[in-house]
A protein has these predicted regions:
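Extracellular glycan-recognition regions
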Residues: 1-202
Length: 202
């Protein structure tokens, strides 16, 4: 199902943005971020997130993010934002003229957990696929929108039947850049059930 961005709802809209039936453009505001406590010992919760609400417990969300990031920590990608202390984000985050961080942050009960891999700084777009199976989530990325590779499998303890999912972009430092999101689509869950070892009995 193709997603009409006009049906999505902002949590903290940025000062500059544009929404059409085909795409979303976000111009980030300086000093916007999502992070809770771990290592840095600060709580940042002011990044704009544009999301769709669903009670569907098995689905995949696909989007292409294009970004003109240029200052450390500039980032754009996908998110499942439940509240300040419980959320998931996956993005490309600018580091310097040589590398960016392709990574994900999972925050449960007010503590964030970041995992990343370095990619070339010349990359200016990325496809993301976010899949849900109940309270479990899988994030994948792709450079062509066809062949996806796993970034992370995680759990959100506070994910009820109804959740919100979508896109975000932010600039934690003194920066602003444009991120354009296209090809927003919700599909049947592409993350198939595990077919190996049987689950433990609860």
């Amino acid at each position: 199902m193709k997603i009409n961005p006009s049906d999505m709802v902002w949590t903290r809209p940025p000062r500059q943005y544009h929404i059409s039936q085909e795409n979303v453009t976000i111009v980030t505001d300086p000093h916007t971020d999502l992070w809770q406590r771990t290592y840095y010992h600060f709580r940042n919760d002011n990044a704009p997130v544009l999301q769709l609400e669903t009670a569907e417990e098995y689905f995949s969300f696909v989007v292409r993010a294009q970004f003109d990031s240029k200052v450390r920590f500039d980032q754009a990608g996908v998110a499942v934002y439940l509240d300040s202390d419980n959320w998931l984000k996956a993005s490309v985050e600018y580091e310097n003229e040589h590398i960016q961080r392709l990574g994900s942050v999972v925050t449960n009960n007010g503590y964030s957990d970041w995992a990343s891999v370095d990619i070339d700084a010349s990359i200016k777009y990325m496809w993301f696929r976010l899949s849900r199976r109940g309270q479990d989530f899988c994030v994948e990325n792709s450079t062509d929108g066809v062949h996806f590779g796993q970034m992370r499998i995680c759990h959100l303890f506070n994910a009820g039947q109804s959740i919100r999912f979508g896109i975000y972009a932010c600039s934690p430092e003194e920066s602003s850049f444009e991120a354009v999101f296209t090809h927003l689509e919700m599909t049947d869950c592409k993350w198939l059930a595990h077919d190996g070892q049987a689950p433990d009995e609860e």
